[in-house]
Design a protein with these regions (language model features):
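Extracellular/lumen-exposed scaffold segments
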Residues: 20-144
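Sec-dependent N-terminal signal peptides
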Residues: 4-13
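Sec/Tat signal peptide C-region and signal peptidase I cleavage site
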Residues: 13-19
Length: 144
C-alpha cells in the first residue's frame, strides 16, 4: 500500500512538472506604460485557459495572486487580450483560451524604484487529448 501511495505521489508530481514545461512564463515591468506584464509562451498543440471561464465546467481558469505590499498599489485587475472562444469536446462547453502566447497586464498606480511585486500564477493546460493538473508558478518583479 505504501509503495502504491508513493507511486501515485510521484506520478502527480511528475505531471505537475510536465505542465510547467508546456508553458514558459516571463514576468516584467514596462516603465513606459507603468504596468506589469505576465507573458505565457505556450507549447504547440496546448492551450491555456482564460481568467474568465466558469470553473464549474471543469478546467481551472488562469489566476494571479499577489503578495500584500503596502508600498505598491494597483489600478484595476489583471487584464487579458481577447481569447479564442471555441466549443471544447472534452468539457462539452464553449470555453475561452489562448494558444501560442498571451500577455496579461496589470497597471501599477504606485510603486517606488526597487520595490518588488511578488505573487504566483495558477494555470492549467490542455491539448486535444488530455489536460494536465493545475500548477502554481511564483513570480517576483522588481520595479526599476
Amino acid at each position: 500500500m505504501r509503495k502504491l501511495l508513493f507511486l501515485c505521489s510521484f506520478l502527480w508530481i511528475g505531471t505537475s512538472l510536465f505542465a510547467q514545461d508546456r508553458v514558459k512564463w516571463d514576468f516584467s515591468y514596462n516603465t513606459s506604460t507603468k504596468e506589469i506584464q505576465l507573458k505565457a509562451i505556450i507549447s504547440e498543440g496546448w492551450h491555456l485557459y482564460s481568467q474568465h471561464i466558469n470553473n464549474t465546467i471543469g478546467p481551472v481558469p488562469t489566476s494571479f495572486t499577489f503578495t500584500e505590499n503596502p508600498n505598491i498599489k494597483f489600478e484595476g485587475e489583471v487584464m487579458e487580450p481577447k481569447a479564442i472562444h471555441e466549443y471544447d469536446e472534452n468539457f462539452e462547453a464553449a470555453l475561452d483560451f489562448f494558444k501560442s502566447e498571451v500577455t496579461f497586464t496589470r497597471k501599477v498606480a504606485k510603486a517606488k524604484s526597487g520595490e518588488v511585486i511578488k505573487g504566483y500564477v495558477t494555470f492549467m493546460v490542455c491539448n486535444e487529448v488530455m489536460c494536465l493538473p493545475p500548477v502554481d508558478v511564483d513570480f517576483s518583479i522588481t520595479i526599476p
